[in-house]
């Protein structure tokens, strides 16, 4: 055996040399010779497989490249290390990317003898050195990187003396000690990880992948069938070292075919026969600042693109098939038409005509006087529109003739591609084949008489399904040719739109005869006829990139949309059941004297009324006077009745049928104006109606709509990536025309600028200017500050002074720009390369002209609009601060894409506005414009209406108004459809893509993720997991103790975890700047720094120095120590908490450890207190030693170490809960109604609580001190909250007793903070709260800065334009001058005289404060439509408002609103999502890691299935089992499906006025539930009750059916007045709708992923709920008696805690929060307060603004967006295709479950290890693992190539030609790889499961994909990967030993045979004698030993032990027992003899 590493797997292992065996041998020679002569080289490598990271050109180009670049490289990057480059902090990256709250910092030290440290270099370092020396001889670049990366490693191991200062103190806590005994395992771990990050190995760190570097074909086609797949593997082992003739080389020579090497990971075929253009891939693009980029160059055999384009154009023109079944491919007319259509000029002509067509339509709809449009020819434009429409129809017909309508299979056939028919795409083919397989061909063919699939297609389908990755399909080609001609007409999306337009145009023309369409109200064909104008978004600009993003996401969009539609229908049916008829009931006033005199209230819904005499509640009544069934909800006042008549908005809005209900459910889904519907139903039914809306919002909006967002984000990212790749290959040809021009000029300017240098005078001038530039920035600040100081009351004189000052500043800034221009005159090109300078120069001229004209009084109000030029200079202020400059730079890194998307959005809105204007013009009468200003009256109005819908604010006002005036039901329906489609497109799609763009600019780059992941693991995950292994909260310990822990906690796992962490830490410190970051001391606290400086300067403050230098405020360090001594090397990981320094400090200042400067650590009372409570922070000390806090410590023997502390915590947790309950119960309203005096039971309870919490405070502060002590009370933030609560409770009590009601209620609100203590129950909830409130504050601050930098300039501009212009007189026809006296005002139906008042609206811009407040409020998109309406109606200062008098004013608000949506709202989402991802570490997961984590969630939900033993079952049970469980009977299965779907149809057909249908429905539901009940009975009988109830879904299904059956039966006898009963019955009938879920894989995957993601979602919901409770209690205590205003009602108020929570829920979605806040600011004289009591109905402006604004930020901006982040993170499996496109889905998991159930019929989830190969061979798919699969299995080969004569089984005919052809398709290299992978897989399963003695269902399921579908190297995180490497190392060792053992076994067996033959009696004869030899066969040779001789048994072959000892998960297990005992018992007398032989 060779004395090297294992030969079997070496060349494919990460830590081996990549140059094959010879290279490895030579490397050793180099290492040995390096000591004597390092310059000598004996041989060169024969085979070169470059590592994935160092992609080196072929040998011919290496030296030339290096010679050219050598000098430059030496000069610029002498000491650069590849590893350090990877870990280097990127230039231009923000510092906040590094985690800002390090828990632990790392220090390293090394101890031992100096000699040993130099010589005892670790093997990993040796191998690294040897490798680097060898590479040095080949590539100068690699040598430098290698030596620099390992120089740190060598220098670190130089020992220090034992007295070194770096040595950790003796008091340091040992976290992990790797002693000499464990060193072997530790070294294995370290080597494995080292190899994973070494340059030589297949690295775990990010690399350039071959598939990514492969250029995309010119048409962007996908991979062909014949392209090789790479086998996912961590190490890809070599199969043989020697190259014998006919052997397979996995490391081919460069001259060999590259197809073999494509199968290897990370390898790129570097040699080509011809020279070709080279593509440069940049490893680190962040180095632009240094004007140097590390370039990795390799050659690709790709033609020049211009040549390629010319070849494509000159390709012969070929048509295929018969278009329309008539025109052949050679038809001259067809060929002429095709050539004409494909001509470039024709395309230009078509686009020109289409643009002209759109312009005509815009002119026609801009200000329409005659709304009869399109077919009446009432305007000159109609003639042109008709002619163009006819031309476009001709274009469509020509295309159909030229290229066919749909079927282009002939073209696919000619190009050798697979053609998918409609049946295949729709899944009908798959279903048909499944049915034929399950129920038999005869039955299915009998039921479906026509042929869905031909025999030839079926054979082809089966062959394709049997294809395997180990074969190359027949005729497979490397690259698919692009199509030379367009596909069939209807195969293009745009052509389909054209077809719809053409058909609709002529249909509409036909219907317009005799004005039939106008009379009947058929309007739908008009908008469809002009749909083709949408083609204009696909012109040559950046806009098609948006469409590409949507196209990439279509498959996932369909999946998510199907889920969304399913639950949309579900809630639609539920809405009909609960709320049918609810909106019909409204209050109507009846005149007591004249019953015919009535008045209907406006939108006051009700459920009953009060009797005018008795005041008892009465049931509602119908329009005909009959009484309703029940009284509920809001009760109409006296003399009013609750009448059920018609639905609002002309009967269009209701829950009365499924269509209307689904419309309103969509309104809920939109999360805007839905709370209006909620409060309507709360009035008409019960308060519990809000639950429907809350659940709807959670399921549809927060969950499923966010999944839709996630699809868009991910698909847009994929599209963007593909676009960048194509742009990289094709250059700028793929970008838009404008972008190409700009880019060209920019490059030209930069080129010219670099050719000229500045003279000395210019350089000096620029230097001087850089020092004085800040003065001009200050002038800009003065200018904008001056503008902000203007108010509506500012005098004309002041305005003139301001104008003159502005002119002066403009002159100065113009001079500055001129000076800059003069300084840049020697090199004007340089000036042009500075866009800010060019912009400043242009703006200075414009502003100077404007200012001069303004002073002269020429401009008037136009000056306010033009002041935007002055204000735009504010950008210089923003970029003068580094933080804001960096943030904006980061956000605008995708500036081009943001610009493209913005232009796309507005242009698309414009085109859709034309279509909408055509459809809706004339629907709402013009006289309604005053009440409904936005109703699609004209093109501009339609544009604004669509923009409003996109912003979601009050979008339903437009919807309801248009539905109200629609002429018929179909128009109403299409109106809803159009609005819903536009809402989804504009808001859910386009605006959410902005989130993707901004998030992309903030997320961690792919190549930085792995280094950041290591850093995050070592700083956060590792310390936290160490804590979690031994500590748990009280609730967690109670759960573990009494309810059993779900996890099997094992000390061996913990030990292995510590070893892994130590290994990672040991390696990480050698990684360039990552190591430096760990080694640098923790940053000093700014407070301490300032304090220490202060004390130096001021002698009197010397005493404060003890505060500055206090070691108790230092952060802990993790110290990694390596020692070499006589006992061997050891590694120690210690936690240094500076305990020695702390004890020294206490000796110097002993009073520091005295609580209240009185209680010493030894004081009895203090020690008693310490027994009751854990330390507030840190460890306690008595001055001589420290004591570990063991409160939360637990082990298997003891869960409660300090029972008294746990009891104390439990008591005060109960007290907190009681306090919360009392606060919710004893509300201010309760106190007032019960007329509570000063002293009552509530006051006594308050005193009790105050006493209890005061005792808690005393105990805690005596135990640990109050503010300045080692474990001070206030150092714990939770204690600080408790302290605030306690103080507020004392103040509240004193104020209450002194009858100071105002002070009392204010401080009473603070007691709500105590509810935050509920968060401490759950660690996850506490971490979530910390993440939101503390860790996220800096991100919120950054987002706030960006918001402010936008809000401030817009506020100033808005103030300039609109100050004093928004006021109106309440008598709308008068201006301010005439607004006095009284006027007649209509109240209800009476005219009342009211005083005229001129006032500003709630949102106005009269001063900077009001303008800032108004614009801040409309950022939340609440109220901006009201402000828009006021601005558009404004006609001047003090003049009366006119409807749409100044429509142009909308420009300001639309621009601000759009920018705030993009850069403020979406920015908040992006910042919060990004911050949460970085804090939790998910931001550092690569695409593959995310895909694997998501697959894990799906796999973890799989459970083994139990099946009965069919042999033991009786015939009846067998029949039931086949019928009800397996559903083998087609007719029975079909019957069940028909019953189910009829049940759903009955649910859908429910409506308010169904006539007799209710009876029919009840009867059918009785029938369907009976059928389902019988089915469940049969199922239970067939499967058996035990197995039946083992599946939760069976139990749930049975419960639902039984309840539905019983309630349905009882419902026939229950009257309608018991509406709760009927609602519950309807709900259970509806739940049967959920039975569809198991039949749909997409829905099942969604729910299974939801179950796996439940813990984090519940945790976040719980945290949010606690905050709801805190704010609800606070608002209730403060505003519980505040009077109702115009925006508050009987339900929208804070009178009770429940109502408060509902209002907070409304505010969380921005619903009218600012108007509610305005109602809470009411003050005297508009409210009253009683001096004699504590009751007042006044509000509080301070508290209203503080509470509601903070809730708006916390809940609406943070928590709702955290749900977005959580949903996107946890459900990305549902929408992401997966990094490796693994194909793991429910159907594949089902195959595995079925295969497992064959062997484990009881469903125990455990099987013997021997079953493993049988399970793996029993099914197909990505979860199976076998060597031969698909067509290569024996069964398939026999079926395909062997014919057996049924009469004579020995008559066999073999198709040798076909068989050989099939066998030639085998990829031999992959087969050999796969064999080794299979051996590894089997052995790793044995290894990991040997301790349990069996295979576990879930463990095996989670292991298989790592060997089949995923690459462990790419998909595993750092900890899991090192774990995987450790196991793989053990497995490889075993495989190597097994091979050695096989050889040894062969030798021993032969030796035993010879020994045995010698002991036998040999007969003597001459073998050569033929007579003797003829008898040999008849001789029975007796092999028994002669009597009397010692009987010896054959020697047993020693075997490797598979037992527990060898596979223990601990490195310290006893390895002595390595031999199996003999299989048969051996006589004791023979032991010595056997021992002798063994020796």
Curated annotation (Swiss-Prot):
Question: Where's it found, cell-wise?
Answer: Cell membrane
Q: How does it sit in the membrane?
A: Multi-pass membrane protein
Please list every transmembrane segment annotated in the UniProt record, as residue ranges: 346-366, 384-404, 563-583, 658-678, 691-711, 766-786, 809-829, 841-861, 904-924, 942-962, 978-998, 1207-1227, 1247-1267, 1277-1297, 1340-1360, 1408-1428, 1452-1472, 1529-1549, 1554-1574, 1596-1616, 1618-1638, 1654-1674, 1748-1768
Q: What is its main location?
A: membrane
Keyword Cytoplasm carried by entry: no
Cross-referenced Pfam families: Ion_trans
User: Which positions form S-S bridges?
Assistant: none
Q: Name one GO biological process term.
A: calcium ion transport
Every copy of the EF-hand domain together lies at 1787-1822
The record's listing under InterPro entries reads: EF_hand_dom, Ion_trans_dom, VDCC_alpha-1_subunit, Volt_channel_dom_sf
Enumerate composition-biased segments (Basic residues): 271-281
Carbohydrate-modified residues: 98, 257, 269, 379, 559, 754, 760, 882, 900, 968, 1153, 1240, 1302, 1433, 1640, 1687, 1732, 1770, 1785
Q: Which UniProt keywords apply?
A: Calcium, Calcium channel, Calcium transport, Cell membrane, Glycoprotein, Ion channel, Ion transport, Membrane, Phosphoprotein, Stress response, Transmembrane, Transmembrane helix, Transport, Voltage-gated channel
List all Acidic residues biased stretches. Answer: 2021-2033
Q: Positions modified as Phosphoserine?
A: 284
Assembly and interactions?
Interacts with MID1 to form a Ca(2+) influx channel.
- Family membership noted in the UniProt record: Belongs to the calcium channel alpha-1 subunit (TC 1.A.1.11) family.
Q: What is the protein named? A: Calcium-channel protein CCH1
According to its UniProt entry, this protein's organism is Saccharomyces cerevisiae (strain ATCC 204508 / S288c)
